[in-house]
Amino acid sequence: KSITKSEEVLDNYLDKQDGVYEVKENTDGDLEVTAPYQTKRLIVESDQVKDTCGASEVYVNEMDHETILQYDSEEKTEEAFQQLSRTYSSCYPDKVVSIEDSTMGLPLSQGGENGQGTYSWGSDYMGLNELKKQAASSGYTRRVTVAVVDTGIDTSNVLFAGRKVSSQSYNFFGNNHNVQDTFGHGTHVSGIIADATPANVELLVLRVSNNEGKSSLLTIKTALQYAVSKNADVVNLSMGFIDVNASLYDYLDSTIDKAYNRGIPICCAAGNGEGGSKGVDV
């Protein structure tokens, strides 16, 4: 297709910036800019990569038969991708995942209990207060662990009073056990779960984002694997990908299948990207 004047101007501008950018026209006729190599990381679904094309760090995951390659610049990442993708059909850049901020500024408690034993209108609307009563009257006290793969948690919120947060909670972005939420989305999601469930439901909080709510495909998969290894009963994901393709779905599918085969359901967001978003809910 011929390049429009707007695309030419944008391309010329981006050529002067650091990094590697791609300009595409979407179905609405708007120009979209993506940075496909911004993580400076490639995922190759093979544990037999002979030539890493100058990677500064190499991690071979023999269990999942994959090699993770880290580079020093986006330009080097692009060059390596062009070369490696000719040899390995399943080779792709690690993608950025956006944890939507549509809940920012919304109060979790909505001003206090609504008289139905819950704080959020959603729990009330779905009758989850009745479910909590049934669970309490049944005498079912076995601990149920829900892994929340998100931005962390602020346990000072009233919804978490008396709620157990697992000591095995982990921050995959900081590589430590500090899962304090600095973005807000994870607290909102965990708050809904706490509001809608009885006290025997424990939260395994897995922080996978930076302070701006950005994560990556590899980080998400690592957190999912961790949740499965810690025998979580349920896993919750509420986030969206930008510029997805079938190979990215396949990459997560292998881990999701392992969870499924162990009887661990994974709950995903619907409508998390809102009406005008170009992202795809996960």
Predicted segments, located by residue:
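Autoinhibitory N-terminal propeptides
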Residues: K1-Q48, S89-T103, M126-G127
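Protease zymogen maturation seam
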Residues: L31-A35, V58, E62-E66, E75, ...
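Active-site-proximal beta-strand/loop segments in catalytic clefts of secreted hydrolases
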Residues: E45-D47, D94-V96, V148-G152, D195, ...
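Helix N-cap motif at beta-to-alpha junctions
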Residues: Q48, Y71-E78
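Second-shell loop/turn segments in exported
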Residues: L69-Q70, H177-Q180, N210-G213, I242
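Extracytoplasmic/secreted envelope proteins and their assembly/folding machinery
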Residues: E78-F81, G186, S190, K221-L224, ...
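Active-site core segment of subtilase-fold serine proteases
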Residues: G111-E202, T222, S229-K230, V234, ...
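Substrate-binding/access-modulating region of protease and related hydrolase catalytic domains
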Residues: Y140, V208-V282
